[in-house]
C-alpha cells in the first residue's frame, strides 16, 4: 500500500535543512496543523454559505448574491464582518456567565472533531485509534451548550428551543452511533485512516456504500438531525419559536451559533465521504493509473499528484452531500416535534440495530467481503 506523503517529516526536514535546530523545527510545526484546521474549516463554511445562498436562489428562480465579489462569493465574508462589529447584547435578566459559555460550548467541540478528519494517508492532524468514537463523544457536548444558551437567556422561546435541541440530539445520537459501529465492525478499527484503507485497493467497488447502503441512509438522516437542518430544524423554527435558543443573541455570539451549524454540516459531509465513499480513494485504483501512465507508485511526483487528487476527492464527495442537504431545505417540509421523535426512536433506532446485527452476521458468513 502506498504510504502516502509524510507532511510533518517533510516540513521538519525542510526547516532543518534551512539551518533551524530539530527542536525548534518541531516547535514551529506544532501550531501549524491546528491553524490549518481552523482556517480550512472556516473557508469550508464560507463556501457552504455561498452555495446555500446561490442554490436557494436558483430553487426560487432568483439570482442570489451578485455584487459582493465575483458571483457574490464575498457575501459570507461581509456577513461575518457585519456580525463582528455589531453590539454584543446580554439581556438584563439573563445569566451572563452561562449566556456567554453556551455558544463557546457549541463551537469548540465541532472544531476539535476536525482533528481526526483525514484528507490523505498522512494528511490529518491526529490519527487516533479511537477516531470516530472521539467524534461521536465530542458531538454529544454541543447540545449541552444549546440547552445552556436556552436556559440562560431567560426567554420562553429560547428555553423551548434549547429543550428541543437536547431532545433531538439524544434521539438521533444513538442511530448515528449504530451506523458508525457497523462501519467500525467491518474495518476492525475506529481509526478514520484505517476505515479508508479498508475501502482502498478496488477503487469504487471497494467503498462501504455498497456493503452499507442502509447504514449510509441512516447515517445521513441522523447527521442532518444533529446539524438541525431542514426538515429537522425544530430547535430554531422561525414560525414557532422566533429563532429558538438564538432569540436573545446578537453580534459575535450569534455568529458562533451560525458558524457552528455550518462547520457541523461540513464535518458530517466529510464523515460520510470517509466512512462510506472511500475518503481520498480515487474511483479507479491508483496502482492501475500508475501502470497505465508507466510510473512507479513510489515516484515523488506521482505521490504529490496522488495527494492533491486525494484532497480533491474528499472535498468533492463531501460537497455533493452538502448540495443534497441544501436541496432538501427547499423540497421537504419541516416535521412536527412528535414526528421527529417518532422517526428517531421508533424507526431509525430499530433499523440501526437490525443493520448492526445483519452486518455482524454477514461478517461471520462472508469474512473476506465484510472485513473478517
Curated annotation (Swiss-Prot):
It comes from the Bacteria. Its main location: membrane. The chain crosses the membrane at residues 27-47, 97-117, 128-148, 166-186, 204-224, 254-274, 308-328, 351-371. It is a multi-pass membrane protein. One of its GO terms (cellular component) is plasma membrane-derived thylakoid membrane. GO terms for biological process: aerobic respiration; photosynthesis, light reaction. GO terms for molecular function: NADH dehydrogenase activity; oxidoreductase activity, acting on NAD(P)H, quinone or similar compound as acceptor; quinone binding. It is found in: Cellular thylakoid membrane. Its EC number is 7.1.1.-. InterPro entries: NADH_UbQ_OxRdtase_su1/FPO, NADH_UbQ_OxRdtase_su1_CS. It catalyses: a plastoquinone + NADH + (n+1) H(+)(in) = a plastoquinol + NAD(+) + n H(+)(out); a plastoquinone + NADPH + (n+1) H(+)(in) = a plastoquinol + NADP(+) + n H(+)(out). Pfam families: NADHdh. Keywords: Membrane, NAD, NADP, Plastoquinone, Quinone, Thylakoid, Translocase, Transmembrane, Transmembrane helix. Belongs to the complex I subunit 1 family. NDH-1 is composed of at least 11 different subunits. NCBIfam families: PRK06076.1-2, PRK06076.1-5. NDH-1 shuttles electrons from an unknown electron donor, via FMN and iron-sulfur (Fe-S) centers, to quinones in the respiratory and/or the photosynthetic chain. The immediate electron acceptor for the enzyme in this species is believed to be plastoquinone. Couples the redox reaction to proton translocation, and thus conserves the redox energy in a proton gradient. This is NAD(P)H-quinone oxidoreductase subunit 1. The gene is ndhA.
Amino acid at each position: 500500500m502506498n504510504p502516502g506523503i509524510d507532511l510533518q517529516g517533510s516540513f521538519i526536514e525542510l526547516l532543518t535543512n534551512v539551518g533551524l535546530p530539530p527542536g525548534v523545527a518541531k516547535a514551529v510545526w506544532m501550531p501549524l496543523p491546528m491553524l490549518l484546521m481552523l482556517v480550512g474549516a472556516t473557508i469550508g463554511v464560507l463556501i457552504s454559505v455561498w452555495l446555500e445562498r446561490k442554490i436557494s436562489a436558483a430553487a426560487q428562480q432568483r439570482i442570489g448574491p451578485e455584487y459582493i465579489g465575483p458571483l457574490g462569493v464575498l457575501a459570507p465574508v461581509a456577513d461575518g464582518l457585519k456580525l463582528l462589529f455589531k453590539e454584543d447584547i446580554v439581556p438584563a435578566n439573563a445569566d451572563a456567565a452561562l449566556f456567554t459559555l453556551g455558544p463557546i460550548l457549541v463551537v469548540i467541540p465541532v472544531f476539535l472533531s476536525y482533528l481526526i478528519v483525514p484528507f490523505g494517508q498522512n494528511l490529518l492532524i491526529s490519527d487516533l485509534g479511537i477516531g470516530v468514537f472521539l467524534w461521536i463523544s465530542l458531538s454529544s457536548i454541543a447540545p449541552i451548550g444549546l440547552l445552556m444558551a436556552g436556559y440562560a437567556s431567560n426567554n420562553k422561546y429560547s428555553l423551548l428551543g434549547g429543550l428541543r435541541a437536547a431532545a433531538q440530539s439524544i434521539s438521533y445520537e444513538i442511530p448515528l452511533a449504530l451506523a458508525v459501529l457497523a462501519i467500525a465492525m467491518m474495518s476492525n478499527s475506529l481509526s478514520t485512516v484505517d476505515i479508508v484503507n479498508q475501502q482502498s485497493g478496488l477503487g469504487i467497488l471497494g467503498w462501504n456504500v455498497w456493503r452499507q447502503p442502509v447504514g449510509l441512509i441512516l447515517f445521513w438522516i441522523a447527521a442532518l438531525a444533529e446539524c438541525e437542518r431542514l426538515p429537522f430544524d425544530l430547535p430554531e423554527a422561525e414560525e414557532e419559536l422566533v429563532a429558538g435558543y438564538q432569540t436573545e443573541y446578537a453580534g459575535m455570539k450569534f455568529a458562533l451559533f451560525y458558524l457552528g451549524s455550518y462547520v457541523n454540516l461540513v464535518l458530517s459531509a466529510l464523515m460520510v465521504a470517509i466512512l462510506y465513499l472511500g475518503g481520498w480513494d480515487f474511483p479507479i485504483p491508483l496502482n492501475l493509473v500508475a501502470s497505465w501512465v508507466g510510473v512507479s507508485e513510489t515516484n515523488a511526483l506521482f505521490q504529490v499528484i496522488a495527494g492533491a487528487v486525494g484532497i480533491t476527492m474528499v472535498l468533492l464527495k463531501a460537497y455533493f452531500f452538502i448540495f443534497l442537504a441544501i436541496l432538501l431545505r427547499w423540497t421537504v417540509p419541516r416535521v412536527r416535534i412528535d414526528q421527529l421523535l417518532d422517526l428517531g426512536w421508533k424507526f431509525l433506532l430499530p433499523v440501526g440495530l437490525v443493520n448492526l446485527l445483519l452486518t455482524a452476521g454477514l461478517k461471520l458468513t462472508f469474512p473476506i467481503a465484510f472485513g473478517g
